[in-house]
Amino acid sequence: MTYLLRRAELEDLPEMIRHESEIFGHDAWSPELMVAEVSHPMSYYLVARSAETKEFAGYAGLRAAVTGGEGGDIQTIATLAQHRGKGLGRTLLRALLEEARNRRVQDIFLEVRADNPTALVLYESEGFAVIDRREGYYQPDGVAALVMRRHDEGPQGGWTQ
């Protein structure tokens, strides 16, 4: 399946908020947090739609200094259930990594639930490595978070672990 990605705008927030709890359940961000995150000057959020049907398919976000710096964070990658397993998560992740590269960010971090093997395999296949484990991070179920990092040596060096 082919997806169209574009920069998220404040007008996209109602749809993003509507799907947040559907995708993440009790780990969902509050509407207020999502508004603050998407409108933050260091945030870069994308929305994805099916190229064929124009149906909302997901969204993803990065937070990193626009002028570069040592670190940035993948804040979220969210795909609707009917679009999982079709390459959308990878497409969104690669688009965020490209933006991080454009911002000259050297280290990209993310957190993933330890009980989410699908996401873990995706991140590892894109060069992320586990660097820490935070026990009991996700509440109320007490699931650990795995902190992952991907390092870029710079414009000439490419991405490395």
Give the positions of each predicted feature.
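Conserved hydrophobic/aromatic "anchor" residues
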Residues: 24, 59, 83, 122, ...
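Acetyl-CoA-dependent GNAT
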Residues: 3, 7-84, 93-99, 103, ...
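Short glycine/proline-centered loop/turn elements that form peptide/ligand docking sites
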Residues: 89, 93, 116-119, 136-141
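Conserved GNAT acetyl-CoA-binding A-motif
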Residues: 100-111, 134
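Conserved catalytic-core motifs of GNAT/GCN5-like acyltransferases
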Residues: 111, 124, 129-146
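Residue-level recognition of the GNAT/N-acetyltransferase active site
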Residues: 80, 84, 111-113, 140
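Short glycine-rich hinge loops at helix-strand junctions in the catalytic core
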Residues: 87, 104, 127
